[in-house]
């Protein structure tokens, strides 16, 4: 089984915090999969279209020489404020469908309570692990 890191971010726009997470995940995994959330949204909260977010992310990743990263688009389940188990199952199924593996590590910078609310305990115990990069640990 491959060691796979997963990052979920809207990238509105991509910034040093996102890149630090991607770099950390790249150093610790064989593959990193970045899922750009709210891919189906183009509004005041999501003013940058998904194709631009994708292109900016790829350019920043390549510019920094970060390897083994794939980028995927992820539509919202319904409302981006949905932090239910429905969202967790939706996210988990989308990730597993893309990476073809049921075990992975989610890299995040805040919101532990939110992330853990997405998944029933059995998924966190058996399939998904979490890795924190505190916002204060990010260099400008």
List the predicted regions and their residue ranges.
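Nucleotidyltransferase catalytic core that binds NTPs
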Residues: 1-140
């Amino acid at each position: 089984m491959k060691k796979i890191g997963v990052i979920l971010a809207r990238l509105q726009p991509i910034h040093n915090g996102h890149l630090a997470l991607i770099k950390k995940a790249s150093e610790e995994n064989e593959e990193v999969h970045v899922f750009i959330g709210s891919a189906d949204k183009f509004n005041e909260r999501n003013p940058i279209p998904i194709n631009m977010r994708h292109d900016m992310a790829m350019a920043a990743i390549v510019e920094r020489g970060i390897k083994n990263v794939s980028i995927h688009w992820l539509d919202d389940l319904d409302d981006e404020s949905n932090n239910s188990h429905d969202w967790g199952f939706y996210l988990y199924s989308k990730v597993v469908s893309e990476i073809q593996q049921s075990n992975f590590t989610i890299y995040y910078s805040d919101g532990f309570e939110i992330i853990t609310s997405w998944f029933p305990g059995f998924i966190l115990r058996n399939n998904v692990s979490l890795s924190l990069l505190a916002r204060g640990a990010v260099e400008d």
